[in-house]
């Protein structure tokens, strides 16, 4: 079970003004050091956030069985039903009581936080493809600002401005406003700032506003996942002031904050990046970055060799850098090329362990590629939106800006690593493994132009439910099956919430899919519309339950984790092939929509699966799908297109074309 990008469509920032005729340049001194000056302190609500509830065991069992129903035949389901009953009345009851007691003793956090960190950090698979996703920025609306040097400078300065704003407590708290006319106002903010932080959440709740957990934000900067035997560690050094830049597999560092914590003049940052872009050194014979794509135990062993070989100080500079800026030397050909580049690249020019890599291609196409153990995308999406808005609306430099007359050869340090023959062999082996894996990955995308959110809402259907129904229908059309499907939902409304799983495959989607795919002529348009409405209603219920911490996946995961921690024999429920099957997520799905995002993507979570990143926009639906050689992503997308056409036909009162 590997959660992907933050799914629920929380509003992140005011709508972007994309066609502003002129732009003020930020001076980056004094007030311009910050993106915003929130009158409510950033962490004002954190202490009073509600705690993530532990569902009742009987509710978890009911929800689990409901999710299993479309995946099992009658005899399999009866067997699973018996195992659930035995678990609920036996060892499960005992484990649940222990979980409740443990949760009572740890009121500073959530019951899932520790186990979830462990799940990520003990995983030994490469972080590339298995965990790290990407989000690509829309181009700067002013085309001349998409020059690589200009955009890299502006994104870097805006990112450092975000860092300063966050650490000064001046970043607006993350709040989900159900009634923004009441809660997203200066008057309310002036009032709530005086409410003690131990009570502030309740004040927001009274005006239908829901503050979200921001505990993950501190890992956004100066952070790296360090490979260790058996379990990795998250490392953060907030004192470091330098940026790490990768280009052609070479490593460079320079300060982006001065000794007083002020942002270095943007024209100096521009000069340093120009200096790096002018370095004509060829790609190193043994590009060290490949090691971050290795199996974690292999990388841990090689890292120790690096340290013992006299590279400790150099590695420390990589690990502690505010973030990693990757400058690529080629433009993007199309969306598929963009996805491959931002999801994995060629392995030489990313440090996959950094909390995030900010990638800027030759044509200014930019993306954030992030490591997933430290957070679920809540912080990344907020950072992403704020940086896009700031860099496009108040850019630090213009295309005609001249770089500072500074000696970058003094300010920029090019890092060099001493590599033993064992390390060189390690890099070569990592490269071979990386190249072989990437050859098996296919990515393809479609844009369905007939309609989107506006049309579906007029038909009183959940846009997300319709997209998920299209995936169920498409898989049935292509492979004749209903399979385990995963949609991640943020539980950031709770203290140290992570994610919960929505299980989109249901008896309703199965019935509706079979009607559309196998027997459309047997059903009237009205019947098909009714089935879609049933799917939408049930999906809405599942989504609400998940967001409120009332799914079944995290609860069962925590009980299993507790059993292992207490040395209890693995309960039979977890040995059931049905449990293995529902957690073998052939359809792993993730959605986000934001004015800043052009598209996102991730790899399948199982070898025979699809990784489906999608967004339902106002008048179109986008879908970016990955697969390994055992599945056909292009054919799947043809099926998705056909299924969306069929559903839109039915909603418009037309007969389904066979």
UniProtKB/Swiss-Prot annotation:
Membrane topology type: Peripheral membrane protein
PROSITE patterns: ACYLTRANSF_C_1, ACYLTRANSF_C_2
Binding sites annotated in the UniProt record for CoA: 452-464
InterPro entries: Carn_acyl_trans, Carn_acyl_trans_N, CAT-like_dom_sf, Cho/carn_acyl_trans, Cho/carn_acyl_trans_2
First and last residues of the transit peptide: 1-25
Superkingdom assignment: Eukaryota
Binding site for (R)-carnitine: 486, 488, 499
Intramembrane segments: 179-208
Residues exposed to the Mitochondrial matrix side: 26-178, 209-658
Subcellular location: Mitochondrion inner membrane
Catalytic machinery residues: 372 (proton acceptor)
Pathway membership, UniProt: Lipid metabolism; fatty acid beta-oxidation
EC number: 2.3.1.21
GO CC list: mitochondrial inner membrane; mitochondrial matrix; mitochondrion; nucleolus; nucleoplasm
GO terms of biological process kind: carnitine metabolic process; carnitine shuttle; fatty acid beta-oxidation; in utero embryonic development; long-chain fatty acid metabolic process; positive regulation of cold-induced thermogenesis
Main location: mitochondrion
One GO molecular-function entry: carnitine O-octanoyltransferase activity
Residues carrying N6-succinyllysine: 69, 85, 239, 418, 424, 439, 510, 544
N6-acetyllysine found at: 79, 239, 305, 418, 510, 544
EC supergroup of this enzyme: transferase
Function summary: Involved in the intramitochondrial synthesis of acylcarnitines from accumulated acyl-CoA metabolites. Reconverts acylcarnitines back into the respective acyl-CoA esters that can then undergo beta-oxidation, an essential step for the mitochondrial uptake of long-chain fatty acids and their subsequent beta-oxidation in the mitochondrion. Active with medium (C8-C12) and long-chain (C14-C18) acyl-CoA esters.
Assigned protein family: Belongs to the carnitine/choline acetyltransferase family.
Name of this chain's protein: Carnitine O-palmitoyltransferase 2, mitochondrial
Annotated source species: Mus musculus (Mouse)
Lineage: Eukaryota, Metazoa, Chordata, Craniata, Vertebrata
